[in-house]
């Protein structure tokens, strides 16, 4: 057991980590273009935050959270999603008192006790974007645009954007009555989880993926027919912005998301190539969450995107992430005196901005050059007694085999030029 990672977790080795770095760097770059700033929140929070923020009727709270009492008897939960901690930080540090909106993003591990499967682990990593303080549908459109821009820049084109409005507490109350009356006639066709949802939060039945439940909800009344004027106008405004940006979308009444805090906009971006776990991004508006968590009455909207699932989607689409380049220079050496000189020279060149590799395995000169090839080094030099005396080396271009004699002090300039 000591040599095996816990079930539902995965090591990211150097052969894969470059893909993560590429994707995460692109996420940060795009967010900066849109004016979003990074936030980092703790890996665990007080359990009450998720009970109030995510909702006690959700699968996350009922089945999936990692919750324990610490040594002081406080109930603590490992971060189960990214929005509630961001809201907590927004309130705790008084960011609501600053000029609005507040635009944040995060890349963070989250923990859920789920059945491990492709693209879904018990520890997975989430990219999220939140914008607090903006009630306009243009904010909803902006976060959708960030997600679509990222996916398209990664080369994903076989996507569906599905949108819905889940209304506000006022119009949703009316719809819940109608929906509950409809579901009452089909209770025996619902799965066990949805029978519980029927009692606690019937809207969540629409989100169920069980086929028997989907057959029932396919005939259910549409929430969009029960929206109040404010929610309907907001949804129409969102569609105008999406149309203006040229995004195709499908209005899907089943999109309600798995969290209780959503109001008005709910959306998902689905890859047609990843199978059962096709949603690569999901989000929406949560105009009551900040107040529910103890802050002022302020709106918010955002999304979450699983990085593991995104990488799986890229793989299934045959999209290859560029591998990092090899070192700028490999310095081979002959003898102990040359090794010491090589070691200090490599450090100096690294400090000045070059990627430099040397041998630590006491290989022969021939083996060192073979190792340089394996590392895909751009240039190589050999330093021995003769080179130490003359202060000159032959700089070898590893791609062409061409050699140029230069002073050791000119190595940096020669490579950079």
Curated annotation (Swiss-Prot):
It is an enzyme of class 6 (ligase). It is found in: Cytoplasm. It holds the Pfam family tRNA-synt_His. One of its GO terms (biological process) is histidyl-tRNA aminoacylation. It catalyses: tRNA(His) + L-histidine + ATP = L-histidyl-tRNA(His) + AMP + diphosphate + H(+). Its EC number is 6.1.1.21. Keywords: Aminoacyl-tRNA synthetase, ATP-binding, Cytoplasm, Ligase, Nucleotide-binding, Protein biosynthesis. InterPro entries: aa-tRNA-synth_II (IPR006195), aa-tRNA-synth_II/BPL/LPL (IPR045864), Anticodon-bd (IPR004154), Anticodon-bd_dom_sf (IPR036621), His-tRNA-ligase (IPR015807), HisRS-like_core (IPR041715), HisRS/HisZ (IPR004516), HisRS_anticodon (IPR033656). SUPFAM superfamilies: Class II aaRS ABD-related, Class II aaRS and biotin synthetases. Homodimer. Belongs to the class-II aminoacyl-tRNA synthetase family. NCBIfam families: hisS (TIGR00442). This is Histidine--tRNA ligase. It comes from Caldanaerobacter subterraneus subsp. tengcongensis (strain DSM 15242 / JCM 11007 / NBRC 100824 / MB4).
